[in-house]
């Protein structure tokens, strides 16, 4: 604002000099004297009542130029402004001297301002002489006469029948006048004049010069930029709200069981909805016009207005809550990676919610909007105390821990990559990587949203410069400044736009990072509440879903069908159709045949001798022996059990489908037997042990 003050002083003195130069016509026979207007801003500053008006000038024209300058003199210290006002008045409203003797025709002459009053201004305004100096020249000369004479001005009136040295005494102001006179209620359009008490008591006025405030609303971006921002926010906040409700229902309503992670995701969904509510409040049009404006001309909404409190409260919960719960999510992920749990999760959650609500209610009398804001938030009064105490400090502490846990988790995942190199199923690793990417993305959004207000605050000169140029133009172009002065345009719209986007996509980022997972489908399939809701509209969900096979069951249908097709190469078409129809039954038959084969093999083990043991019987015995040995040696013979069970299944299928394929079965058994030897070298030992038992 100091820079603006200097610019206005320059403008003030420039117009003062312009007024003086235009009013100095040494002899103007058509000039006239008039009684000073009672509404003139200089009425109390003069010790005379009749003023000199050169040809073409009126009191109204002089008053129109003097009034804004009088107003701007209020920016100076009291002693300086009072003397500067006096000098302005005696230079613009010169004392009129009538009844000059011996001249014809009769005409009045002006009294120039005395030099001592100019010197007084230089003395009391010495701190501003670096700016005022070129314009307050007390030794200036115009048309051969001193502009600020020490005693008076000599006029040569011989051409009019008068004296060659007619002296007219210099004039001075009313020294009894001071700066406590009634203020001039004038501001150039579109600025609005507001008394000081109202500005101080109600706040939220954008004061440019003393008592002159910007109108509400004042556009600080182009129409295209406003539309781009509005439509982007409307679309993204709508999607973000839908995504947030999806997260709340998926992780907070439908699950049959709840984890700490579920609750944190629900918390994040709630805070994202709070941000959307604050946006909805600020974009509402109550009776038309801009939401930020009140019925008081020039005043933006503050804590005196209920809607401002509502919007600021939800924005504080949404912004601060998102940051705190993201740090809690990163902490929970850190514990999970280290095989630990948060035993005090309930207490932590309650404490965080209490802290968020506390920080939203504490500054309830300090929410306000402004020319640069989209809605209501914490004011920057008291050296930004409320912003730092209620938002920046807790959010930056939470962001610090969020960063620590993210870095620690990245290191943990890096170590996990070594462990998962030899494992085909890397889903756990991929899920952890996705969670980290989500946290990094959401951390960027949060960090940008919290840093942008600080950027605006600490670069305020760049933004106020646009206002200064605009206001200076208004004063320099009275009364047409509003028509000729360009609109205020704040710099860095791209940053402002990015700030709006990062807040609007919180729910969308949450959906991508947390709500798209194969596990989600399982939640809905198993959800009792979801099935109940579907049942209300006549939809059955999950009743015919496949059940998991028990351990020891046969292979899937695709394996069974493959064996059947291989053994039916010689069958006719009817047999193939019959088998396809009975494919579901063959699975059960395999299990029965497998049991029968095992029983038959046990009989062979108990009754046979080495002399009557053939290769097929030996293979069956080996299969059964392997199954028995697997009960005692799970670690060594699991693969043999699976292979031998498959052999039995293949044999059973072959027996069911074609009784004439014994040779093929033997070949298959031999091949499978060879595979068993390749998978487990203990088969030979099993054969020897079987022969020994038979002996």
From Swiss-Prot:
GO terms for cellular component: membrane. It is a multi-pass membrane protein. Residues 545-695 are annotated as: Disordered. Residues 593-608, 626-686 have a biased composition (Low complexity). Residues 24-233, 284-307, 365-387, 457-500 are extracellular. Belongs to the G-protein coupled receptor Fz/Smo family. This is Frizzled and smoothened-like protein O. It comes from Dictyostelium discoideum.
């Amino acid at each position: 604002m100091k820079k603006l003050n200097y610019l206005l002083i320059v403008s003030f003195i420039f117009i003062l000099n312009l007024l003086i130069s235009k009013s100095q016509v040494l002899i103007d026979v058509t000039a006239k004297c008039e009684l000073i207007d009672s509404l003139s801003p200089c009425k109390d500053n003069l010790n005379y009542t009749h003023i000199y008006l050169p040809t073409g000038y009126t009191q109204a024209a002089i008053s129109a130029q003097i009034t804004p300058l009088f107003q701007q003199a209020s920016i100076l210290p009291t002693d300086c402004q009072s003397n500067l006002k006096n000098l302005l008045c005696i230079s613009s409203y010169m004392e009129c001297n009538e009844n000059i003797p011996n001249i014809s025709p009769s005409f009045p002459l002006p009294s120039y301002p005395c030099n001592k009053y100019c010197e007084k201004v230089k003395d009391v305004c010495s701190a501003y002489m670096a700016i005022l100096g070129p314009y307050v020249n007390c030794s200036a000369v115009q048309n051969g006469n001193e502009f600020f004479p020490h005693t008076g001005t000599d006029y040569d009136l011989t051409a009019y029948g008068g004296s060659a040295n007619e002296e007219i005494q210099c004039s001075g102001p009313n020294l009894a006048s001071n700066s406590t006179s009634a203020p001039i209620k004038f501001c150039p359009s579109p600025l609005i004049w507001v008394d000081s008490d109202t500005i101080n008591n109600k706040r939220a006025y954008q004061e440019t010069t003393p008592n002159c405030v910007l109108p509400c609303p004042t556009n600080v971006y182009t129409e295209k930029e406003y539309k781009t921002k509005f439509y982007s926010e409307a679309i993204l906040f709508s999607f973000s709200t839908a995504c947030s409700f999806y997260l709340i229902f998926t992780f907070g309503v439908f699950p049959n069981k709840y984890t700490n992670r579920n609750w944190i995701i629900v918390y994040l969904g709630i805070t994202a909805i709070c941000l959307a509510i604050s946006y909805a409040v600020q974009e509402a049009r109550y009776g038309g016009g801009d939401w930020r404006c009140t019925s008081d001309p020039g005043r933006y909404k503050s804590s005196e207005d209920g809607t401002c409190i509502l919007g600021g409260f939800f924005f504080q919960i949404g912004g601060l809550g998102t940051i705190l719960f993201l740090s809690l999510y990163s902490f929970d992920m850190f514990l999970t990676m280290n095989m630990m749990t948060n035993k005090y999760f309930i207490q932590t959650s309650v404490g965080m919610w209490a802290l968020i609500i506390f920080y939203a209610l504490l500054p309830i009398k300090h929410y306000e909007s402004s020319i640069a804001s989209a809605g209501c938030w914490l004011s920057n009064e008291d050296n930004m105390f409320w912003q730092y105490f209620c938002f920046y400090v807790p959010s930056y502490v939470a962001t610090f821990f969020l960063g620590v846990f993210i870095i620690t988790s990245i290191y943990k995942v890096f170590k996990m990559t070594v462990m998962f190199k030899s494992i085909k199923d890397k889903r756990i690793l991929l899920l952890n990587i996705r969670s980290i990417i989500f946290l990094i993305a959401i951390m960027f959004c949060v960090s940008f949203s919290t840093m942008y207000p600080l950027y605006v605050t600490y670069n305020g000169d760049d933004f106020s410069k646009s206002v200064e140029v605009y206001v200076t133009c208004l004063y320099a172009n009275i009364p047409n400044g509003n028509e000729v002065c360009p609109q205020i345009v704040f710099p860095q719209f791209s940053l402002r736009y990015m700030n709006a986007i990062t807040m609007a996509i919180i729910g969308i980022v949450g959906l991508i990072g947390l709500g798209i997972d194969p596990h989600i489908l399982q939640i809905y399939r198993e959800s009792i509440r979801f099935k109940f809701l579907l049942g209300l509209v006549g939809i059955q969900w999950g009743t015919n879903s496949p059940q998991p096979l028990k351990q020891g069951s046969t292979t899937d249908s695709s394996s069974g069908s493959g064996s059947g097709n291989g053994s039916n190469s010689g069958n006719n078409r009817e047999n193939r159709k019959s088998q396809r129809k009975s494919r579901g039954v063959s699975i059960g038959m395999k299990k029965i045949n497998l049991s029968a084969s095992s029983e038959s093999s046990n009989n062979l083990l108990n009754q046979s001798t080495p002399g009557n043991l053939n290769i097929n019987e030996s293979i069956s015995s080996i299969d059964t022996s392997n199954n028995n040995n697997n009960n005692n040696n799970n670690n060594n013979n699991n693969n043999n059990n699976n292979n031998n069970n498959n052999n039995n299944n293949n044999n059973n299928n072959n027996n069911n489908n074609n009784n004439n394929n014994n040779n093929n079965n033997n070949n298959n058994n031999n091949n499978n037997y060879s595979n068993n030897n390749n998978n487990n070298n203990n088969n030979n030992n099993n054969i020897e042990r079987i022969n020994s038992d038979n002996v």
